[in-house]
């Protein structure tokens, strides 16, 4: 779905078809929206849904076997995603932020031009490093994030190591487009994704 200034707008695809997407952008502009955050699927990149849309920054989290019904191989899937990061592609974003926690991320960082790199596994040389310091019974995690010369500690209510990587990437993307990291991080304490790793508590003695 889509949300514009707190109002839910029903949409069905991860990335809407081009006419719908541009209509949404036009509505946002009329309503005074200045920034858009969206998920761009490999389908959208391959099928022209974001053609003519200029992106300030793009983030790459990871690559897994999610869409092999559409892509015949992982290599084809990677090449589709690379359209968003390769400076030779007409679809590439102005800035790239890439999580290098796996081989696909490391490879994408080599494709992109001057990417900001994010790591959660203690890698040397990354631009943004995140570490889980601990977690409570609800799954909420204490996270330390090093960005440039600054170190931040915050509570992330979303469980799972992948959400530490997602949060670090989001902070790095926000910083790349001029958002104050401290202000952005303060909002992570209220982050939730309904239906995704959502805790259900009905009084049971298990999570």
Tell me what each language-model feature is.
Residues 10-15, 52-56, 114-115:
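Short, hinge-like loop/turn segments at secondary-structure boundaries
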Residues 44-51:
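Conserved helix/coil segment N-terminal to the catalytic DExD/H
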Residues 1-3:
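Short beta-strand-centered segment that lines the nucleotide-binding/catalytic pocket of NTP-utilizing
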Residues 6-10, 156:
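Short acidic, glycine/proline-rich loop/turn micro-motifs
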Residues 9-41:
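Conserved nucleotide-sensing/catalytic segment adjacent to the nucleotide-binding pocket
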Residues 30-33, 37, 55-206:
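Acidic, Mg2+-coordinating active-site environments of NTP-dependent enzymes
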């Amino acid at each position: 779905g889509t949300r514009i200034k707190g109002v839910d707008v029903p949409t069905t695809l991860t990335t809407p078809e081009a006419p719908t997407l541009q209509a949404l952008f036009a509505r946002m502009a009329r309503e005074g929206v200045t920034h858009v955050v969206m998920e761009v699927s490999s389908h959208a990149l391959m099928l022209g849904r974001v053609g003519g849309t200029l992106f300030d920054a793009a983030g790459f989290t990871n690559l897994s076997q999610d869409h092999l019904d559409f892509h015949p191989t992982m290599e084809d899937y990677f090449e589709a995603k690379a359209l968003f990061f390769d400076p030779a592609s007409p679809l590439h974003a102005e800035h790239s932020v890439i999580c290098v926690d796996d081989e696909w991320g490391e490879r994408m960082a080599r494709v992109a031009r001057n990417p900001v790199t994010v790591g959660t596994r203690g890698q040397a040389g990354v631009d943004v490093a995140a570490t889980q310091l601990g977690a409570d019974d609800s799954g909420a995690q204490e996270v330390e994030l090093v960005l440039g010369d600054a170190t931040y500690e915050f509570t992330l209510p979303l469980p799972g190591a992948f959400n530490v990587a997602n949060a670090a990437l989001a902070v790095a993307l926000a910083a790349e487009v001029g958002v104050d990291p401290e202000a952005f991080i303060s909002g992570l304490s209220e982050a939730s994704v309904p239906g995704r790793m959502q805790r259900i508590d009905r009084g049971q003695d298990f999570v």
